[in-house]
Amino acid sequence: MAGPGSWRDKEVTDLGQLPDPTGIFSLDKAIGLGTYGRIFLGIHEKTGSLVAVKVMSARKTPLPEIGRRVRVNKYQKSVGWRYSDEEEDLRTELNLLRKYSFHKNIVTFYGAFFKLNPPGHQHQLWMVMELCAAGSVTDVVRMTRNQSLKEDWIAYICREILQGLAHLHAHQVIHRDIKGQNVLLTHDAEVKIVDFGVSAQVSRTNGRRNSFIGTPYWMAPEVIHCDEDPRCSYDYRSDVWSVGITAIEMAEGAPPLCKLQPLEALCVILREAAPKVKSSGWSRKFQNFMENCMIKNFLFRPTSGNMLLHPFVHDIKNERRVVESLTKHLTGIIQKREKKGIPVAFEGEEAAKEQYITRRFRGPSCTPELLRVPTSSRCRPLRVLHGEPPQPRWLPDQEDPQDQELQQLQKAAGVFMPLHSQDNTSKLFPKQVEVAPYLRGAAQVVMPVLVQVEAPPQVSKAAQMLKSLPTQDNKATSPEVQAPVAEGQQAQHEALETEQPKDLDQVPEEFQGQDRAPEQPRQGQAAEQQQIHNPVPEQPPEEDREPEQAEVQEEAVEPPQAEIEDKEPEVVQVHAQVLLPLLSQNRHVLLPLHLDRQLLIPVGEQNEEVPRAQAWDLEASRAVGAVQALIEGLSRDLLRAPNAFVTKPLGPLQIFLENLSTDGFYTEPEPTQKKKSKVASLRKAIAKRLRPKRFRAKALWRLEDFEFSDVETSRRRRHRRWEDIFNQHEEQLRRVENDREDDSSDNDEVFHSIQAEVQIEPHAANPAGNEVHERSAPMPCNRNRTHRVKFSPSVGEEEPSLEEAQPQQQQQQPMNIRPRNCLNPQNFQAQSDSSSEEDSPVTRRKSQSSPPYSTIDQKLLIDIHVPDGFKVGKISPPVYLTNEWVGYNALSEIFWDDWIMPTRPARPPEEDGDYVELYDADANANGDEEVANGAYEDPRDGANGHDDMNNQLDQANGYEGHGAAGYNGGDVGGNHGAAFNGPRANYPRAGILKNGHNDGRALNRGAFGVFGDNAARAFHGAAGEAGAAFGNHGANRGNGRGNRNREANGRNEENGAFGRDQHVFPEFEHEESDRGTETSDSIALEITSFDGEQNSGRPVSSTTMGFPIGRSSPRGSDFGSDISYNSPILHVYEKDFSSEVYCGSLWGVNLLLGTQSHLYLMDRSGKAEIVKLIKRRPFRQIQVVEQLNLLITISGKKNRLRVYHLSWLRNKILNNDPKSKKRQKAMRKKEEACKAIDKLIGCEHFSVLQHEETTYIAVAVKSSIHLFAWAPKSFDENTAIKVFPTRDLKPLTVDLAVGSEKTLKIFFSSANGYHIIDAESEVMSEVTLPNNNVVILPDCLGLGVMLSLNAEAASEEANEQLLKKILDVWKDIPSSVAFECTKRITGWDQKAIEVRSLQSTILENELKRRSIKKLRFLCARGDKMFFASTLSNDHSRVYLMSLGKLEELHRSYAV
C-alpha cells in the first residue's frame, strides 16, 4: 500500500462525490455494530478477498444553512452547507484513515464509497477497511478464561499500540479514545488501532472541541481537568494514559472504576491517585510500565516513543513464541465465535451507547466553560499556527458547529472570557479613553485583529499610561484620533442578528503572509497612514471591511445586559494575540509565536504635557520597545516568586501591573497565596529540569570545534539575503495580504497559537539605550540566567536605538530561547554577539538543547528579542510541551522527522536557497500540502537541492557546513548547541567540518535516533508492502557558502515528480507492511512498482531518493541518469522465501542462498529464477571458494562443517541432461559431492582466507577454534593444522587476516568481547571495547558487529583503531560494519543500513524499514552488497545494494 502523498492527501469534502461501490464491493452479512452504523463482511468482487465494510446512513448533500460561507478550496469561498455532527465525524475519520492508515498498527483503509439508494431509503456511506477477524481487545479479553490475558500478550499488544500512537503523534494526531474496543486484532495477532472519529478533532482549526473528549474510564486527568479549568491543556501524552488503562483492562478484564457512573469516574480519576492492578501476581516491569503510563502530571509522563523503550515492551523474551501463542489463542476465539454465531467484529450495544453519550460531551449541551477557550493550541495542526496559505484539507463545515455553539452561548449571555474579575462582573470605564493613533496603528501594522475589551477601572487607570506620547525623534504630529468605542460582545451579538454572519475561520493576515517582513515605512505607507487616520467605527465593520476586524466575539467580554444599557463601556483596543494570553493566564506569561514580528502597543514614557496623540510613522522599532516594556512588567509581576526582591521602586508600569493583579482582573480559582506557591513550584520544577548537570552525562560538548567567526559571517550574509528576499517579493506578499478573505481560521487561533513560556527574573529595567552595552557584556554562567532575549520587529531588519544619544543603528539578530549550556564562561564573552544570532523565528522551532522532557512540539518555540534595558533571566520551553527523553536511544525520528517541512509556494521561488524560510517550516506537519521534501532550488549556486530539512533550515538561516557546532552523539535530551541550536540540526564533528559537509550525524544508529543528518531522515521506511527507501546526497556540490552534499537529481525542481510529492518520503519511516505476507503482487513504491504494474497514477518521485528502489532489472525510464550513475541503487528481488534466509554467497554472477530447510540458487543473469539445489537441510553459513571448486557450509541439524563440490551442484542445475544425472550418481558413490570435514559438530561460524595459494579456514566451535589449511597436495584437508582453545569463552564469530608482519591472525568474538589470536605464537589478546557490547566479526550472520577487512589491511593496531572509529561514528555498535572497495563503511543493524564515507565518516545513505524484523548481511563483491530481510511474517526477501558511483569504480578499481 502506498504511503501518503497521492490520493491520501486529498480531503473528502463532499460525501456525494465518492464513487459508488456497485461492482467493486458487495456486502455479505452483518458482523458487528458500530457507533454510527453496522459493520458488514464485504467481498471484493474481482479477487474475492474479505474486508470489513462500515455502513452508515448519510446524506448526499448536506443540510442547507443560508449565509454560511465555507471553504471549498484554498482560493475561493461560496455559500455552502453543513453536515450533521455524526456525518462530520465520519467524514473527518475517513480523511484521517486515508492519510495515516499506511502504518502496520493502524487499520488499513481501502476506500470510501457512497451508495445511492432509491427514493424512500437513506443513502449509505461505505467505509471499507481491513478485516480484523479476532475482534477488539475487549472482546478477546471477555472470551478468555478468567478474563485476563497473559503478561507477555499484554506486553506485545501494548507495544503495538504504542507504535501506532507514535505514528499518529508524529503526524500531530491525538487519538483521544484509546481503549480496548478501539484496538482490534487480526487472525495472525496483528494489532490495529481504529475509530478516529474523535481524533479527527485534533486536525481542525476550532479549539472548542479539543477539550473534553474521550471515553470517561480511559480519559486522562489532564483532559478531565480541561472541563473545570479551560486554561489547562494537554498534549499527545493523554493517549499514553489511555494505554495504561487499556493494559489494566487486559489484565483484569475491565478498566478501573468501571462500576462507577461515568461522571463519578471522572471525578475519581481527577482527584484520586493513578489506578493500579489489584493482583500482586504481575511482574515488577509490568507494574512499572503502568506507573509510567499513568503519571498524573502529564508534564512528567513519557511519550509513546519513550514508552517504547520501556523494558516491559522493549525486551519481550521469545517474541516469536509470544506471537504464536497469541495467534493460536485468537484462532480458538474465532472458531468459538463461528460455532456460537457470535459476530466476528462485535462492538456491544453498551459500548455504542457509551460512545454516543461520550460524544455528546462535545455538543452544545456542554457547559460554557468547555467552549469558551481552546484548551491548547498544541491540539491543533501546526500548519494553521504559522504562515501557511489556506489548505484544501480544511473541511467546508468545520466552522459551522462552533458558530452554532457560540450563537447559543451568546443568546444565553453566557460567553465567558479569561479576562474578567473573579466575581464575574464587568466594571466599566466612566468615560471614553483616548488612544493615540500610533497605538492603534501599531496594533494594525501586521495584526489587523484587535480585541475590544471592556476593562475594570484599574485598567482604565492603566490606559492613561498608554496614551499618546511624542516619539523620540520628534516626528510631526497628526490630527488626534479618537479611540474606537465598542460595546464588545453585545455589539457583535447585535451584528450577528442583523447582518450576515461572518466566517469564523478567517485566517488572519499574519498567518497568510507571515513570511513577509513587517511593514516598512516606505512600503505601503499611504495605505497604512490611511488606516491610522480613519477612526474605527463604534459598531463592527461592514461586510466590505476585513472580516478579521469584525469577528472578535471570542475575545470580548459580554457584560450583563443591564449594565450595557445603563452605561457605555470604555474600551481599550489592544492586540489580541498578545494581551489576552498575557492577561488570561496569570500563572504563566505566554509570548505567542512570531511575537518579535508583531507590532503591538507602543508604550512610551508618560508625558502629562502632551494631551494629544502624536503621529506615528509606523516605525517597528519604536513600537516593539514599548510593547516589550509592558510584557516585561507583566512577566515580572506574574512570575515573581513570593520572596522575590525588587531593588528599585515601582514605576508607573509596575503600578499598573500591580493594580491589574490585585484587582482580580485575571480569572483565578485559587487564592492568591496558593497561586504564588504554584508559580514558585513551577519555577522550581523548570529550574530543576534545566540544570546543566542533567545534560552533562548525555551531551559532551566540544567547544573547540565551534567557529564563531564563521557563524558571524553567515549571520551577516543571512541578514543581507533576507533583505533581498523581502524586497524582491514585496509584490507577492501584497497579493497574499489582499487575498486574506480567501483564508479562514478561528479567531481563537489568533491569540491562542503555540506559545512559549518566558520566565523573567524580577529586576528593574535598564534605561533605554543600554542595549549595546548589555549585548556586549559577557553572560554570566548561571543556570538561573542562561538566556538573553532580544525583541525585534523583523528578521534581518536593522532597528535604530531607542535613545537619541546613539544615532547609529544596532543590528538585532534573533536569539533562540532554548537553554544554553554554561560550560565555559569565556565562550559566552566570545559569543556576545553571535550567541544571539539564531535563525529566523519562522523556521527555528526545534530546540536541540531541550530539557529531558522535551517533546515534538518544542520546535514550535519562538525566537524573541530583548527590548532595550531589559534582562531576561531564564527562558524555558513551555512546560506543558515538555516530555522526558530517555537518553540518546529515544525514538526521536518518530517525532521529529515529519514535523519540520517547508511549505511549497505556488511555484519554486527564484531567490536564494534561504527563501525557504519565507514559508513556514512547520506548516506541512501533516504532509497534506503539495510540498517538496527538499529545499527550493537555487539556480545560481544549486546549494539547496537537499532531501533533508536540516540543510534546508541551515541554508535558510545561513549556516555554513564548516561553521556548524560539533554534535557529539545522538543525545536527544542533552544540551547540544550553545550558540547553534538548530531545529534537529545535528552538525558533524571536526573531521567532517574539514570536508565542508553538513550532513554527518554522530548518533545512536542502533536506537534509530535521527537528528540532523541530511540523508537518513529522508527515508527510513518502505513504501507499501515490500519497498525500501534510502536517503542520499549523491555528489558533493560546492557553492559560495560552503560545500554541502546535495541530491544528484535534485535540480529538477520543476518536475512534478520531483517537486510535488517529495514530502511523502519522510513518512515512510513509519510505514510498515500492511499485511502479514509480502508478495510480489502487493509491492507498491513511489519510485518503481515491484510487481510490474504502473504506479496507479502516482508520479514517480525521486528527488530525495538516494537509493532508488526498483526491481532486479530496473526500467530506465524510472531512474534519471544522475541516479543511475551517481547514486547507490537498491534492488529488491521479487522472490518471497517462505522461510528465513540465513546466509548467501556469490557463485559467479549467481547467488546461493541458504535457508532453514533448503539451499537455493538465484539466477541473477536472467529473470532471477530460483533453483532448489538441496532439500531438507538447514544452512547456517555458506561460502563459495571457486579456486577449490568447493562450497563450504555449516549445515544440518548438528551444524556440521560440510563441503559441496561446485561441479556437482552445477550438474544438479543441468539435470535435464541424462549425462549429468549419471555423473551425479557417480559422484555420490565416491563421496565427491558432499562430505563432512573433521567430523566437527556444533560449528558456530567459519571464515575463509586465501593467501599465497593457500586457503585457510578458521572454524569456531563450542570452546575452541580449528584452523585448516588447504593447498594443492600440501595439507590434509580433513585434519586441522591447529586447534586454539578459547578458555572459557564461547566463540560466536571468527575471522582471519594477515597482519602487518605477514603473520596470520585469528579474530573472534564472544559474549565477553573481542579477541585476537596470533596463529604462530598462539597468544590470545583482547581488544578494548565497552563491556556491554558483543562484537561479531566479518562475514558473519549479521548478529553483532562485523568487520570485513581486506587481507592486506588486518593488523591488531589497525583493527583496534577501526573499532574506535566505528564507536565514534555510531555511538553504539550496529549489527555489522563492513569496509568496501568503494572506501565506504556500511553498517547494518536489525532494521537499517547505513553507508558512510570511510575518510570522513559522513553518512551518505541509509535504508530503513519498519516491516523488516532483521537485516542480515549475506555477501559482498566490489560495490555490490546482498542482504536478506526477515519480514513480519517470518518470510524473507533478498536485497541487492550497489554502493559505488560507477565512474569512480571504473576509474579506481576497473570494475
UniProtKB/Swiss-Prot annotation:
Compositional bias per record (Basic and acidic residues), positions renumbered to this chain: 494-505, 1044-1078
Chain positions recorded as ATP binding sites: I31, G32, L33, G34, T35, Y36, G37, R38, I39, K54
EC number, UniProt record: 2.7.11.1
Positions carrying Phosphoserine: S847, S850
Gene3D superfamilies according to UniProt: Phosphorylase Kinase, domain 1 (3.30.200.20), Transferase(Phosphotransferase) domain 1 (1.10.510.10)
Any Pfam family the entry gives: CNH
UniProt cross-references to PROSITE patterns, sorted A to Z: CNH, PROTEIN_KINASE_ATP, PROTEIN_KINASE_DOM, PROTEIN_KINASE_ST
Catalytic activity field: L-seryl-[protein] + ATP = O-phospho-L-seryl-[protein] + ADP + H(+); L-threonyl-[protein] + ATP = O-phospho-L-threonyl-[protein] + ADP + H(+)
InterPro entries named in the record: CNH_dom (IPR001180), Kinase-like_dom_sf (IPR011009), Prot_kinase_dom (IPR000719), Protein_kinase_ATP_BS (IPR017441), Ser/Thr_kinase_AS (IPR008271), STE20_Ser-Thr_kinase (IPR051700)
Any Gene Ontology biological process: parturition
Range of residues in the leader sequence: none
Keyword Hydrolase: no
Family: Belongs to the protein kinase superfamily. STE Ser/Thr protein kinase family. STE20 subfamily.
PANTHER family found in the cross-reference section: MISSHAPEN LIKE KINASE 1, NIK-RELATED PROTEIN KINASE
Name of the molecule in the record: Nik-related protein kinase
Organism field: Mus musculus
Gene: Nrk
